[in-house]
Amino acid sequence: MLKTTKKSLLVFMGVFFLIFGVDQAIKYAILEGFRYESLMIDIVLVFNKGVAFSLLSFLEGGLKYLQILLILGLFIFLMRQRELFKNHAIEFGMVFGAGVSNVLDRFVHGGVVDYVYYHYGFDFAIFNFADVMIDVGVGVLLLKQFFFKQKQNKIKA
């Protein structure tokens, strides 16, 4: 059991640092002036003071501390749920790497560095690579849980 947990922690850390590093590298390019415009997608610089769709922006500077508490609380919870952590180390690495990267932005830049603006046919919220990785990580985790439950139900029947 300890070996599996150690392996899962290494996988988690590898994915965490990969996602964190890629996200910060992209944001660095955006902060240095990289821009792109097209009929569908623009790359622009926006500092998001809230969370998804700028929600909770009224919390201003306090939001980053709330997010740190949330991240630490979830990490402590996961360390106590060894089986869950072992089965989803990659997904949790994606979510935590992206989440920590966005929180770092709040401390360094005063808001999350967002830059992808999709506007073909309708306006969509401006987002970043970390946001996508959080969505993908949570989506894969939910799909794996759903199919695992389906498999368990067939075994019981």
From Swiss-Prot:
The membrane topology term of the UniProt record is: Multi-pass membrane protein
Q: Which GO terms describe its molecular function?
A: aspartic-type endopeptidase activity; endopeptidase activity
Enzyme class, top EC level, equals hydrolase
Q: Which UniProt keywords apply?
A: Aspartyl protease, Cell inner membrane, Cell membrane, Hydrolase, Membrane, Protease, Transmembrane, Transmembrane helix
Q: Where, subcellularly, is it found?
A: Cell inner membrane
Active-site residues annotated for this sequence:
114, 131
Provide the primary localization: membrane
Please write the reaction equations for the catalytic activity of this protein.
Release of signal peptides from bacterial membrane prolipoproteins. Hydrolyzes -Xaa-Yaa-Zaa-|-(S,diacylglyceryl)Cys-, in which Xaa is hydrophobic (preferably Leu), and Yaa (Ala or Ser) and Zaa (Gly or Ala) have small, neutral side chains
Coiled coil, from the record: none
Q: Where are the transmembrane segments?
A: 10-30, 58-78, 84-104, 122-142
Pfam families in the record: Peptidase_A8 (PF01252)
Work out whether the entry's keyword set contains ATP-binding.
no
Identify the EC number(s). 3.4.23.36
Q: In which pathway does it act?
A: Protein modification; lipoprotein biosynthesis (signal peptide cleavage)
Q: Please give the superkingdom of this protein's source.
A: Bacteria
Q: Which family does it belong to?
A: Belongs to the peptidase A8 family.
**UniProt function note:** This protein specifically catalyzes the removal of signal peptides from prolipoproteins.
What name is this protein filed under?
Lipoprotein signal peptidase
Supply the source organism for this entry. Helicobacter pylori (strain ATCC 700392 / 26695)
